[in-house]
């Protein structure tokens, strides 16, 4: 039974598991083969079953298997090895073989039923010529048989070339196969993709079927030496096939040269020292009528039915490389699904784990506005650690949220960092590096101080014009910039508002100034805005000159004023300090020349210089919308020269300078450092305090403005996402939060910002002002539609008036419009409005106290307490607390109050009375009644 194929081995060759054994047995029944779990089958049966399972070729099996009980028949190869009669078996095999040679010549081959020792059966299950059921005995062919074999070669040459072409095309590319094998190759390809990589490797390896020539062992040659010596030397089968093989090789070379095709890969020989393998993978039939082989020859030709031992490693590597390349292409393909993206994100997560090994920097430099992830990158910290630290401190942020100054300071303390904040906009600006000779420039002087201390009047006297009278209420509400000439030298003055609402405007004035003049009224002394102005000047690191105004008034105490300044750290020169205190009178003009000379001396000491060549860099002091001009801005140049026709951008605004007008109303063409002018040609009103940058053309200006707009939009979204735990708690607790939606319109950008900040300061935990829209310019129909869509909304206008059409639309929409010319009135009216929405403060007033001496239970009425008034007056219907042993038991109202049997409105101290509470009867002797009334008071902001 050595030639039989075990069913389990057959399953292993197919790459199937024991679970699929039942399906294989059912498929064997379809071709007439009865199998069981431990059954064995002949190689012929195994081959037909393999073709049926893999290729779908159904060949019925004739049941000619030997009966195991008939031991004398010697039907199995094992029994044939015993010494029995040989001649009858050979003749029987011939008689069975001849009829099949006439019908199917190309599907016949010798069967491995021989009596020789050392016979090896090899099976690849892909042989193109299936073996016959009963193989003939092997004998040595004659010379005529050799000639017939050569003639047979010519007859099958056409079919051999077609099959050879099919084999070659399958080796290069499975998709270029002929139509006869195309469907089979596609089905096999789909099956290979569905199975495991091991099955894929086994099925992709090229297999070959051939004849194995096996030599006798030395002991066999010795036992049969007498038989072989008596025979004459004849040509062996190996020689026959070697001649045939040479002819094929010569014809193959001619065919390949003509078609310029690639040479097929050589098949590695089996590792057997005593055997030779001849490749017949092209289904060539060499079975002739006289192909009878002698058993007694030294060499035997057997049909190869075993799988090839040596695997083609190069093909295996190529298959694996193709799979890897295809997977790599799919991962990098942008049109694929998200699988590749997830793969890359895993790599990023592995990379992030290495962040724990980073060396944290001790000193870092960051911009004023920095995101969480940017801070982590600058400090070389793990992003998760930064977010976790903020979370533990009660602030929930994402990596794209911006950090405020407090958060940056907290992170610096937590991670032991030293942080320097840089005030740059390099990411959004295209400022060129200015190279050239620096020239002397005029000083920029900012006049600051408390409201109504005479700042604008001082500047008015210097300019000899009545500027203060043009402001509403005599209060400066805009930044004014002017140029004044003194002793042949120019000085630029910036007048800032003194009202508390204009803190940001004073801050902008201090940032662009060289010298700060603090105006203090000699009869009023240092006030709140005076201290604030000094703080702005200190932060800007600019020298300070004190102007003691209103010296013309009586009862002026200069020593008191100097003492107040000295307490703040500003010691006068005559007191041994370094600060100049100059007495002036803006009304009479006394001391103004001395002030100007002091300013020029300070400017000479500072040696103020700037580069005049190149692109301009300026600061926007104020922006507004003027009728007939559109958006305009007051700017002061810091470096370079701004000319008419130059392209520029400032924050989200951009444009080209159309006109420039100085403080005298004259048109100018060029604006040099420290000069101020009003420019037109802007796309929108720029924010006050923004930096104006001159660029090469309009395209660059538009691009930079769009970048800045995107940045500001992200920052605004970041503010809406950040929330603290305390804010969440307040939002949950204050379900009845009241707010007033407003639309604010003003004539200038600076005034608009001042109003917004002042109104937002009025917000508290109960009521709030919600600014749904704000802008510079007149009231439009768009503003009305915004207010109409919001309940209880109002429009606030500052220094503007609605047109007739807008008024009609407002009546139609039932929208309230309120306009103001003084900021005081606007803020106070909104304060009153908020106070009206706020719930009043409730206070309690103690009115009386009574002690329970006896209780009376009256059916269907309740419990009446007999009391004595010990303090105050007890009134009917008043609120009362029932106190027992110092603990409040009940709070309610007095339902009935009687004096003996008569009803009483009130009972005074020292008198007895009867008290019955509303819906409460659990009164005991010794309890105390305490009466009180609630007083509602208005809240204050």
Swiss-Prot record:
Residues 164-179 have a biased composition (Low complexity). Keywords: Cytoplasm, GTP-binding, Initiation factor, Nucleotide-binding, Protein biosynthesis. Pfam families: EF-G_D2, GTP_EFTU, GTP_EFTU_D2, IF-2, IF2_N. InterPro entries: EF-G-like_DII, EFTu-like_2, IF2_II, IF2_N, P-loop_NTPase, Small_GTP-bd, T_Tr_GTP-bd_dom, TF_IF2_bacterial-like. Residues 440-609 form the tr-type G domain. Signal peptide: none annotated. Coiled coil: none annotated. GO terms for cellular component: cytosol. It is found in: Cytoplasm. Residues 61-204, 249-274 are annotated as: Disordered. GTP binds at residues 449-456, 495-499, 549-552. Residues 474-478 are annotated as: G2. Residues 449-456 are annotated as: G1. Residues 147-163, 180-204 have a biased composition (Basic and acidic residues). Residues 585-587 are annotated as: G5. Residues 549-552 are annotated as: G4. One of its GO terms (molecular function) is GTPase activity. Belongs to the TRAFAC class translation factor GTPase superfamily. Classic translation factor GTPase family. IF-2 subfamily. One of the essential components for the initiation of protein synthesis. Protects formylmethionyl-tRNA from spontaneous hydrolysis and promotes its binding to the 30S ribosomal subunits. Also involved in the hydrolysis of GTP during the formation of the 70S ribosomal complex. This is Translation initiation factor IF-2. It comes from Helicobacter acinonychis (strain Sheeba). The gene is infB.
């Amino acid at each position: 039974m050595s030639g039989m194929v075990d069913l389990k081995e057959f399953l292993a060759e197919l790459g199937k598991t024991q679970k699929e054994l039942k399906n294989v047995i059912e498929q064997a029944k379809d071709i007439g083969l009865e199998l069981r779990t431990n059954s064995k089958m002949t190689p012929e049966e195994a081959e037909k079953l393999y073709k049926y399972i893999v290729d779908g070729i159904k060949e019925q099996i004739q049941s000619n298997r030997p009966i195991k009980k008939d031991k004398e028949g010697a039907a199995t190869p094992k029994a044939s090895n015993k010494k029995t009669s040989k001649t009858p078996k050979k003749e029987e095999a011939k008689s069975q073989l001849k009829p099949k040679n006439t019908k199917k010549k190309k599907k016949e081959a010798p069967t491995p039923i021989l009596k020789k020792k050392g016979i090896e059966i090899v099976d690849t299950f892909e042989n193109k010529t299936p073996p016959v059921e009963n193989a003939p005995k092997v004998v040595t062919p004659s010379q005529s048989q050799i000639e017939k074999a050569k003639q047979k070669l010519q007859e099958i040459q056409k079919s051999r070339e077609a099959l050879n072409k099919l084999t070659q095309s399958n080796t290069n590319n499975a998709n270029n196969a002929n139509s006869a094998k195309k469907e089979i190759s596609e089905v096999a390809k789909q099956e290979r993709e569905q199975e495991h990589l091991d099955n894929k490797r086994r099925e992709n390896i090229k297999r070959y079927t051939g004849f194995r020539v096996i030599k006798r062992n030395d002991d066999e040659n010795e036992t049969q030496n007498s038989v072989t010596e008596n025979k004459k030397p004849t040509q062996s089968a190996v020689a026959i096939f070697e001649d045939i093989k040479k002819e094929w090789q010569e014809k193959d070379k001619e065919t390949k040269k003509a078609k310029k095709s690639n040479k097929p890969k050589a098949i590695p020989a089996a590792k057997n020292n005593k055997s030779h393998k001849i490749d017949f993978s092209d289904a060539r039939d060499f079975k002739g009528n006289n192909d009878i082989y002698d058993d007694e020859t030294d060499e035997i030709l057997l049909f190869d039915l075993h799988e090839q031992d040596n695997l083609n490693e190069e093909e295996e590597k190529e298959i694996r490389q193709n799979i890897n390349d295809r997977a790599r292409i799919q991962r990098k393909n942008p049109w694929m699904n998200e699988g590749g993206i997830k793969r890359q994100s895993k790599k990023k997560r592995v990379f992030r784990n290495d962040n724990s090994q980073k060396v944290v920097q001790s000193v870092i430099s960051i911009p004023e506005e920095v995101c969480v992830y940017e801070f982590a990158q600058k400090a070389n910290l793990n992003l998760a650690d930064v977010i976790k630290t903020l979370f533990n401190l009660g602030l929930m942020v994402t990596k794209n949220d911006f950090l405020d100054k407090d958060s940056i300071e907290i992170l610096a303390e937590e991670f032991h960092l030293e942080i320097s904040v840089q005030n740059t906009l390099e990411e959004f600006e295209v400022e060129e590096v200015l190279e050239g000779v620096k020239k002397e420039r005029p000083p920029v002087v900012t006049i600051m101080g408390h409201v109504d201390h005479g700042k604008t009047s001082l500047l008015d006297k210097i300019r000899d014009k009545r500027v203060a009278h043009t402001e509403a209420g005599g209060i400066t509400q805009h930044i004014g910039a002017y140029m004044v000439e003194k002793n042949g030298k120019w000085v630029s003055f910036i007048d800032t508002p003194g009202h508390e609402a204009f803190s940001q405007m004073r801050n902008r004035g201090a940032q662009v100034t060289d010298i700060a003049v603090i105006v203090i009224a000699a009869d009023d002394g240092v006030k709140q805005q005076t201290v604030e102005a000094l703080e702005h000047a200190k932060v800007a690191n600019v020298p300070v000159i004190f102007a003691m105004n209103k010296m013309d008034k009586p009862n002026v105490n200069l020593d008191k004023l100097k003492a107040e300044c000295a307490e703040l750290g500003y010691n006068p020169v005559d007191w041994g300090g370094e600060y100049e205190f100059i007495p002036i009178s803006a009304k009479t003009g006394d001391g103004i020349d001395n002030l100007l000379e002091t300013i020029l001396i300070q400017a000479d000491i500072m040696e103020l210089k700037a580069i005049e060549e190149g692109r301009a860099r300026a600061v926007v002091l104020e922006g507004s919308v003027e009728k007939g001009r559109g958006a305009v801005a007051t700017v002061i140049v810091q470096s370079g020269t701004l000319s008419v026709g130059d392209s520029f951008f400032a924050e989200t605004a951009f444009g080209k300078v159309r006109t420039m007008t100085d403080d005298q109303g004259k048109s100018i063409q060029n604006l040099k450092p420290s000069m101020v002018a009003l420019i037109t040609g802007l796309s929108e009103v720029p924010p006050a305090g923004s930096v104006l940058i001159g660029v090469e053309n309009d395209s660059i200006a538009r691009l930079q403005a769009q970048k800045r707009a995107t940045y500001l939009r992200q920052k605004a979204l970041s503010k809406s996402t950040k929330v603290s735990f305390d804010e969440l708690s307040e939002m949950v607790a204050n379900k009845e939060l009241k707010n007033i939606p407003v639309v604010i319109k003003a004539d200038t950008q600076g005034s608009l910002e001042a109003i917004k900040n002042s109104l937002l300061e009025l917000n508290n935990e109960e009521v709030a002002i919600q600014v749904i829209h704000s802008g510079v310019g007149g009231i439009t129909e768009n503003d009305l539609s915004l207010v109409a869509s919001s309940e209880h909304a109002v429009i606030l206008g500052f220094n503007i008036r609605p047109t007739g059409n807008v008024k009609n639309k407002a009546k139609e929409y039932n929208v309230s419009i309120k306009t103001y010319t003084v900021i005081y009135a606007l803020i106070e009216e909104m304060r009153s409005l908020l106070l009206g929405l706020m719930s009043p403060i409730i206070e309690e007033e103690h009115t009386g106290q009574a002690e329970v001496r006896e209780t009376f239970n009256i059916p269907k009425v309740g419990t009446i307490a007999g009391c004595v008034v010990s303090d105050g007056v007890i009134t009917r219907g008043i609120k009362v607390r029932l106190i027992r042993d110092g603990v409040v038991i009940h709070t309610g109202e007095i339902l009935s109050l009687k004096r003996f049997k008569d009803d009483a409105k009130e009972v005074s101290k020292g008198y007895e009375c009867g008290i019955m509470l509303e819906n409460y009867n659990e009164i005991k002797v010794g309890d105390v009644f305490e009466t009180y009334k609630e007083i509602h008071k208005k809240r204050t902001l």
